[in-house]
A protein has these predicted regions:
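Switch/communication elements of ASCE P-loop NTPase nucleotide-binding domains
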Residues: 1-73, 255-391
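Broad gene-expression machinery/nucleic-acid interaction feature
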Residues: 2, 16, 99-103, 114, ...
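Glycine-centered tight beta-turn/hairpin loop motif at sheet-sheet or coil-to-beta transitions
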Residues: 12, 108-112, 134, 261-262
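Coil-to-beta-strand transition motifs
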Residues: 14, 97-99, 110-112, 121-125, ...
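Conserved P-loop NTP-binding catalytic core
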Residues: 34-50, 54-56, 63-121
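Long, charged, glycine-rich C-terminal linkers/tails
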Residues: 85-87, 242-252
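Short beta-strand segments that buttress and anchor functional surface loops
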Residues: 102-107, 129, 256-258
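Electropositive, glycine-dotted interaction segments
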Residues: 114-247
Length: 391
C-alpha cells in the first residue's frame, strides 16, 4: 500500500509534486469501511485516488514517474552505456541539466518504508531505503556517488541482514546506472528485509495499465484455469447480454456466448467489442489486487460500467489501491467518493504540471464537486475559445 509518492523534474513535472493516499480523518462517510485501508488507529490509507485535468496537463506523467521508479527496481538497465532512462523537464534549460528526485512511502505488513533516490540520465546520484519496524526509523541501505571517481558506495544499516561478504558483493554489483535493489536481485545473496521490498515492487506495485495493455493482460491470461470462471462472473453481471466466454485445447482463442431472444450466439474473439475486452481486462486486473496505476480509466467503457468496476474493486479487495486518470466527471458524484480521493492537474505559466487535492478547497460536504468543477471553481479544466471559425 502506498502512503505517498513524490517526484521532481521528470517529463512535464518541474517542481516537486506529491500524490497522497493518506486519508483525512476529518472526512467520514458511510462507505469508509470499504474505501479505506486501516493501518493504525491514527492512520488510514485510501484505496482509490482519481486524477482529473485537461488534455496535455500532465495527468499521465505522474503515473509514468511512478512506473519509472518501479522499473528501475524491477527491470534495471542492460548495460553501463545505456543510461538510466531518466527524462527531465525540458521547457527550462536549467532543469535539463539537473537530476530528478523520486520518493515512495509505502507499507508492507503494517510496516512503513521510505524509498527515495536522485538520478540523472547517466547514473544514480543517491539512493536510500529506510523502514520503521518498531515505529522508529532504521536504515536498510544508503548509496552515494563520488563524482570524481564515478564510484558508488553503499552503506548498510544493522537491520539489513547481510554478512560483510554479502555487503561487499552487493556494493560491487551496484554500478552507476542500476538501482541497489535491482543489483540485489542479481547478486545471489539473501536478506529477509530486502526480499520483502523487492517482492513488493515485483508483485504488488503493478505497471501502468493503459487502454491497450488492459486487453493484452486479459488475453495473455485467458488460458489460466481461474480466468474463465472469473471472466464469466464479470460478464454475467455486466448487463452486456453475454453469458460467458470459453476456450478449448483445439481452439485456444476465446469465443463469447451472446444471449439473444433466439438463444445463444457464438462470437469469436476478433469480432468482440473493444469495450467488452477492456472491461474484462480491467475487471480481472482489479480483482488481482495490488497497487494499480490506470491511465484513461473510462476508455471504451460506459460510465456505469466504470462505476461498477470501482465498486467491485472496493468491496472485494483488501490492502489494494488504484490511482487512475480520467475525464469522466460523473465519477465525482459516486456515493463512496470523498474529497481527499479526487486530485486535479493543470499546468502553470512555465508549462509545468501541478497536482492538488479537492480537499484543499475546503468544500462543504453538501456541495457537488462535479458542479464546482464544471463551473471552473476548482481549475484543471480547459477554457475554450469561440467555436465559430471564419477562413
Amino acid at each position: 500500500m502506498i502512503e505517498s509518492f513524490s517526484v521532481k523534474n521528470f517529463r512535464s513535472i518541474k517542481h516537486e509534486q506529491t500524490i497522497s493516499f493518506l486519508a483525512n480523518n476529518k472526512i467520514q462517510g458511510s462507505s469508509d469501511t470499504y474505501v479505506l485501508n486501516k493501518i493504525s488507529d491514527s492512520v488510514s490509507l485510501l484505496k482509490f485516488c482519481i486524477l482529473y485535468g485537461y488534455n496535455a496537463s500532465g495527468k499521465t506523467n505522474i503515473l509514468r514517474a511512478l512506473d519509472f521508479l518501479r522499473s528501475l527496481v524491477v527491470d534495471g538497465t542492460t548495460g553501463s552505456d545505456t543510461g538510466t532512462g531518466f527524462e527531465p523537464f525540458t521547457l527550462d534549460e536549467t532543469t535539463t541539466q539537473e537530476p530528478g528526485t523520486f520518493a515512495l512511502i509505502f507499507y508492507i505488513e503494517q510496516i512503513r518504508y521510505t524509498y527515495r533516490f536522485i538520478v540523472d540520465k547517466k547514473h544514480f546520484i543517491s539512493e536510500e531505503l529506510t523502514y520503521q519496524p518498531m515505529g522508529r526509523k532504521a536504515l536498510l541501505f544508503r548509496r552515494t556517488h563520488d563524482e570524481g571517481t564515478h564510484i558508488s558506495t553503499v552503506e548498510f544499516g544493522t537491520k539489513c541482514g547481510l554478512s560483510a561478504k554479502e555487503r561487499a558483493t552487493l556494493s560491487g554489483n551496484t554500478v552507476d546506472t542500476i538501482s541497489t535493489l535491482f543489483a540485489y536481485q542479481k547478486s545471489n545473496i539473501h536478506s529477509v528485509e530486502l526480499e520483502l521490498v523487492v517482492a513488493y515492487f515485483n508483485h504488488v506495485l503493478k505497471p501502468v495499465v493503459t487502454p491497450n495493455t488492459s486487453v493484452e493482460i486479459w488475453t495473455g491470461r485467458v488460458g489460466q484455469s481461474e480466468m474463465i470462471p472469473l471472466s464469466n462472473i464479470l460478464l454475467q453481471r455486466s448487463g452486456l447480454h453475454i453469458e460467458g466466454v470459453r476456450v478449448s485445447e483445439k481452439n485456444p482463442a476465446p469465443v463469447f456466448q451472446h444471449r439473444t431472444s433466439l438463444g445463444f450466439h457464438s462470437l469469436p474473439f476478433d469480432e468482440e467489442s473493444q469495450g467488452t475486452l477492456r472491461y474484462l481486462g480491467l475487471g480481472t486486473t482489479m480483482l488481482d489486487g495490488g497497487v494499480i496505476p490506470i491511465d484513461e480509466l473510462e476508455a471504451s467503457l460506459h460510465p456505469d460500467l466504470v462505476a461498477f468496476l470501482l465498486q467491485m474493486f472496493l468491496l472485494n479487495t483488501t490492502g489494494s489501491q488504484i490511482i487512475a486518470t480520467t475525464h469522466n466527471q460523473s465519477l465525482m458524484e459516486l456515493d463512496f467518493m470523498r474529497n481527499d480521493m479526487i486530485w486535479l492537474c493543470e499546468k502553470d505559466e512555465d508549462g509545468a504540471s501541478e497536482y492538488y487535492s479537492v480537499q484543499e478547497f475546503g468544500l462543504h460536504k453538501r456541495i457537488s464537486i462535479g458542479n464546482a468543477y464544471r463551473a471552473g471553481k476548482l481549475g484543471a479544466k480547459p477554457y475554450l475559445g469561440d467555436p465559430t471559425i471564419q477562413l
